[in-house]
Amino acid sequence: MRRRFCLAMIGCSLAAVGALPALAALGEDVSSVSTDRVQMHAQLKGTTSAAGFSVQEIENPRGTVVREYVNPSGTVFAVSWAGPSKPDLRQLFGSYFQQYVNAANSVRRGAASRRHFEVTQPDLIVESNGRMRAFRGRAYVPSLMPPGVTPGDIS
């Protein structure tokens, strides 16, 4: 009886998590950056502009810095992170999160290093690496990148 109750509670919890709206930034309008900041309890560190895009930088309470790259049409085309913990990737990837999960699950066990992980899909590139207290990564949607911007511009 107790086991059945525990399983029911786990099932309800998973269903509730799956029902949450996607509030993440990747592929979303620049206004989602504010949503990310609130959802991650982060502070805006600054906004910078470069040729063809702007970068909004936020820092969560654990010290992880997240940069969200916005193209001239106001769409977030890339995110990057660096710090002692990984940020909430579901929050940052939004509608691309399931594509990321599917690609990650298709990688054979043992084929990817624990310290370095890469997903390369036609419309989603994710690179993540690190160890305890030193994580970094980036994700971008090539079709949303402004002309002249390269993956090297996303740090």
Model-found features: residue ranges?
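Sec/Tat signal peptide C-region and signal peptidase I cleavage site
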Residues: 18-26
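Bacterial N-terminal signal peptides that target proteins for export
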Residues: 1-10
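Mature extracytoplasmic domains of secretory-pathway proteins
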Residues: 70-110
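Bacterial N-terminal signal peptides
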Residues: 9-18
